[in-house]
A protein has these predicted regions:
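Active-site loop immediately N-terminal to the catalytic Tyr-X3-Lys motif
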Residues: 1-5
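Active-site helix of classical SDR
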Residues: 10
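Catalytic Tyr-X3-Lys helix of short-chain dehydrogenase/reductase
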Residues: 13, 18-26, 31
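SDR active-site lid
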Residues: 27-96
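Residues that scaffold the ATP/ADP-binding catalytic core of kinase and kinase-like folds
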Residues: 43-47, 110, 122
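Non-catalytic terminal and boundary segments that flank Rossmann-like NAD(P)-dependent oxidoreductase
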Residues: 118-130
Length: 130
């Protein structure tokens, strides 16, 4: 996500770590799963402390990106739906290393696997950093 490089990188790192750890400990009957939740409608959006330092230099793209993320969060899944999904995964004996909540995010994850990196970047940029 533009202007969220650390956030995006940390999510990628957690997923990679989870997959590697699952591979290391699965011979001992231990499974590790990352649950990719997508947007969740919580009080986080209203509590966000915004800073758009550099917005003028980027032609308003930072504030547009934050605004789009807020819209996504406000239309996200409820915490109850996510909690039920996580509980269902936790009860499984054998789970995939990465589980994705919601049909929308499953489709997006699939598209990320098949689209070239440059095209993915252009699509995400057109949504979040016009």
């Amino acid at each position: 996500i533009p202007f969220q490089a650390f956030y995006s990188a940390s999510k990628a790192a957690v997923s990679s770590y989870s997959c590697a750890l699952d591979n290391e400990v699965s011979p001992y009957g231990v499974r590790v799963t990352t649950v990719e939740l997508g947007d969740i409608h919580t009080g986080f959006t209203q509590a966000r402390q915004k800073t758009v330092l550099g917005d003028d230099e980027y032609g308003g793209r930072i504030s547009h990106s934050v605004s789009q993320m807020e819209k996504d969060e406000l239309s996200g899944m409820s915490p109850e739906v996510i909690g039920t999904y996580i509980a269902r995964i936790a009860q499984k004996k054998n789970c995939a290393p990465i589980c994705v909540a919601g049909v929308k995010y499953k489709i997006l994850r699939f598209l990320c696997k098949i689209l070239p990196c440059t095209l993915r970047g252009k699509i995400v940029g057109s949504i979040y950093a016009k």
